[in-house]
């Protein structure tokens, strides 16, 4: 929808298929939705870690488990998208003010993540996860998510993308601080 109509992600944009590994469908590299699916899973696991439960069994947290991961996804996108634009992996017909990324792209990711999580919550099962799983094994995706913005800040600084670099570092520090506060 976004590449053809310009809706959702801040205007018409296109991917540079020469820089995207693997196959594509309708000029959208499959690695993009696969990557974002993995990121959403990592973010959900992180939210489980800081909320002190399982996202499958937090019925009173429905709104939190829709909004918090959506906001975290946008914060991560503030770090990752400037790198991709700088590497010319994708571009918009009308460049945005934030390192070439239009503001509405971030609104689009907030909405898209919220919608994906809403559908997930509608169809989730009551599958019981073994409670005897080791803490680090169970929460390794969430722990990795804590580090991801800091890891992404390095290429930001290497390319002179200072604001996304600092956002990445501060974001990681905040994520780690929340985990420490919630698990002490």
Give residue spans per PLM region.
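Aromatic-rich, lipid-facing transmembrane alpha helices and their immediate juxtamembrane interface loops
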Residues: 1-184
């Amino acid at each position: 929808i976004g590449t053809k109509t310009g809706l959702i992600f801040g205007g018409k944009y296109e991917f540079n298929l020469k820089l995207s590994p693997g196959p594509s469908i309708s000029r959208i590299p499959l690695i993009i939705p696969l990557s974002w699916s993995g990121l959403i899973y990592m973010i959900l696991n992180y939210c489980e870690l800081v909320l002190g439960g399982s996202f499958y069994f937090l019925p009173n947290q429905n709104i939190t488990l829709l909004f918090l991961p959506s906001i975290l996804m946008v914060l991560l996108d503030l770090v990752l998208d400037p790198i991709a634009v700088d590497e010319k992996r994708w571009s918009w017909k009308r460049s945005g003010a934030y390192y070439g990324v239009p503001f509405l792209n971030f609104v689009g990711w907030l909405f898209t993540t919220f919608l994906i999580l809403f559908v997930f919550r509608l169809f989730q099962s009551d599958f019981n996860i073994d409670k005897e799983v080791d803490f680090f094994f169970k929460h390794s995706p969430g722990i990795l998510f804590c580090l991801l913005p800091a890891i992404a800040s390095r290429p930001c600084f290497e390319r002179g993308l200072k604001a996304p670099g600092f956002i990445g570092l501060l974001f990681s520090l905040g994520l780690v601080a929340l985990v420490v506060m919630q698990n002490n």
